[in-house]
From Swiss-Prot:
Name assigned to this protein: THAP domain-containing protein 3
Xref: SMART domains: DM3 (SM00692), THAP (SM00980)
Subunit-structure text: Component of a THAP1/THAP3-HCFC1-OGT complex that contains at least, either THAP1 or THAP3, HCFC1 and OGT. Interacts directly with OGT and HCFC1 (via its HBM).
Record's keyword annotation contains Metal-binding: yes
Species per Swiss-Prot/TrEMBL record: Bos taurus (Bovine)
Keywords: DNA-binding, Metal-binding, Zinc, Zinc-finger
GO molecular function: DNA binding; zinc ion binding
Upper classification of the organism: Eukaryota, Metazoa, Chordata, Craniata, Vertebrata
């Protein structure tokens, strides 16, 4: 059975032609998150089943994880992008009272009911719930602002570390290995000495091979000129 999106007024179906479109199942293991999904879909008396899915067009880009080749939803992702207006919808606003975006984990959630002025497809007025994420109040009052994050300072407080100071902190290159030498003349001298030593060893090896060949040929000649030396051990073994 082909997959189709469960959102209201959405006709997206699973097709190989649209590979960028993905379908995601409802979070049955998390009841609170499941309620948010069902409210945002905007279908009256809707009960999702185990294989009910919703397409990726109803999620914002920040709801997806940036790791991996597939589109994976984050653990707190909620569908908020819909083409219809007026149904019961739970909208998450990641803005604090000062107008700046805040973190969902650090803020304090408050659910405020609002009566919607629009009508549903069946002609009924329904309430919309808006979830506002607020930051905890500061000691100075509600109007206090959070100071911006300052970079790590160097030895003098109040001054950022300058690029020359950062360069001084970098470790120097060790020079205890032969390949770390920076003097080219020394390397050339070592190379020439090694080549000369290698040539001497080759000559000595060649001379030793010639000596071994001569000794082998002499031994063969002696054994060939005295056949009785090979027969004597055999006679001694028979006696």
């Amino acid at each position: 059975m082909p997959k189709s999106c469960a959102a209201r007024q959405c006709c997206n179906r699973y097709s190989n032609r649209r590979k960028q479109l993905t379908f995601h199942r409802f979070p049955f293991s998390r009841p609170e998150l499941l309620k948010e999904w069902v409210l945002n879909i905007g279908r009256g008396d809707f009960e999702p089943k185990q294989h009910t899915v919703i397409c990726s067009e109803h999620f914002r880009p920040e709801c997806f994880s940036a790791f991996g080749n597939r589109k994976n939803l984050k653990h707190n992702a909620v569908p908020t992008v819909f083409a219809f207006q007026g149904p019961p919808q739970l909208v998450r606003e990641n803005t604090d009272p000062t107008g700046r975006s805040g973190d969902a984990t650090s803020g304090e959630r408050k659910v405020l009911p609002e009566t919607g002025s629009g009508e549903c497809g069946l002609g009924r007025k329904m309430d919309t719930t808006v979830e506002v994420l607020q930051l905890p109040p500061e000691v100075g009052g509600l109007g206090a602002q959070v100071p911006p994050h300052t970079p790590e300072t160097s030895g003098v407080p109040g001054q950022p570390a300058s690029p020359p100071e950062l360069k001084r902190r970098l470790p120097t290159q060790p020079s205890d290995h032969s390949y770390a030498l920076l003097d080219l003349d020394t390397l050339k001298k070592k190379l020439f000495l090694t080549l000369k030593e290698n040539e001497k060893l080759r000559r000595r090896l060649k001379a030793q091979r010639l000596v071994m060949r001569r000794m082998c040929s002499r031994l063969r000649a002696r054994l060939a000129g005295r056949p009785g030396l090979q027969a004597r051990p055999r006679l001694g073994q028979q006696s």
